[in-house]
A protein has these predicted regions:
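A short acidic Gly-Thr/Ser loop motif
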Residues: 1-4, 25-27, 144-152
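Short beta-strand scaffold segments in enzyme catalytic cores
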Residues: 3-10, 32
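Conserved ATP-utilizing enzyme core subdomain
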Residues: 16-118, 197, 210-233, 240
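Short helix-capping/linker segments at secondary-structure and domain boundaries
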Residues: 37-44, 126-128, 192-203
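Phosphate/ATP-binding catalytic cores across multiple sugar-kinase/actin-like superfamilies
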Residues: 106-138
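Glycine-rich phosphate-binding/hydrolytic loop that grips phosphoryl groups
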Residues: 115, 173-224
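C-terminal helix-coil-helix/basic helical segment that borders enzyme active sites and/or dimer interfaces
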Residues: 126-136, 143, 166-175
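Glycine-rich phosphate-binding loops at beta-strand->alpha-helix junctions
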Residues: 138-161
Length: 247
């Protein structure tokens, strides 16, 4: 998972399209925006969650619950996706202004906004994932990637609220992928599959039920060289063959 998106892989399913994917909430957007606002642009994120950790004892739970209860997106059913058009810097600014007016410290503000993100993830799991699980309803493993992987306050809250789940960064998974490299690797894979004309299974909750080629290729000056590398045939495309693709 990223801090604003969840992808659920059933442990027992051998069907590629059995996975579930949706956006959980603001991710790092609010935290990063609040850091810029509170430091006059000198800091763009909470490095290692240091500032938020100092304010954890002063988290304003009422603000967390109020936001998560009254933002309609959190009650919206799947499939759903969102972005900065909803979870914007302006929303973060309104929370910062409200807390500053109440005399809250910078540390408390960052901790509270971090908790909004972390708790939005937990509630999304409880609402959309746990009901689909068989047996004891426990999520076995949660792997974090992206910027949130480097904010221990998020990870700590997830582990606290989901004590029977293993919460780790993505590099602890069998793939051992660097948490910050996953998206780049994914785009490279999608580009490879797009050039090969290989469709990708869509999530089980997606409005489209048909596998689709994910992405559009914009050829550059070395496009033919790229095709040769991808398909493994120096005569491609003159022979009108796809080449040797090993997956």
């Amino acid at each position: 998972m990223r801090t604003g998106n969840a992808t659920i892989l059933p442990a027992t399913s051998k069907t590629p399209s059995a996975y579930l994917a949706f956006d959980t909430g603001p991710g790092n957007v609010f935290i990063d925006a609040a850091m810029r606002i509170l430091t006059n642009g000198e800091q763009h994120y909470d490095h290692n969650g240091a500032l938020g950790a100092k304010g954890e004892a002063d988290i304003d739970g009422a603000i967390v619950d109020d936001y998560l209860t009254n933002e309609p997106y959190f009650q919206q059913k799947l499939p759903k996706t969102t972005g900065r058009e909803l979870f914007s810097d302006d929303v973060a600014r309104s929370i910062v202004t409200k807390m500053k007016s109440a005399g809250k410290s910078t540390e408390a503000i960052i901790a509270t906004i971090t908790r909004i993100t972390a708790e939005s993830i937990v509630r999304a799991y409880e609402q959309f994932v746990v009901p689909l699980l068989e047996g004891d309803g426990i999520i076995d493993e949660i792997y974090i990637c992206g910027g949130g992987a480097y904010n221990p306050n998020i990870k700590k809250h997830l582990q606290s609220r989901l004590p029977k789940s293993r919460v780790s960064n993505l590099d602890a998974a069998p793939s051992k992928l660097d948490p910050s490299a996953k998206e780049a690797i994914l785009f490279a894979l999608l580009g490879f599959l797009a050039i090969c004309g290989r469709p990708v299974p869509v999530a089980a909750d997606a409005e489209s039920k048909q596998p689709a080629i994910m992405g559009v290729v914009t050829p550059g000056q070395n496009y033919h060289d790229v095709l040769q590398i991808v398909v493994g045939d120096p005569d491609f495309p003159s022979k009108r063959v796809l080449g040797r693709v090993i997956m």
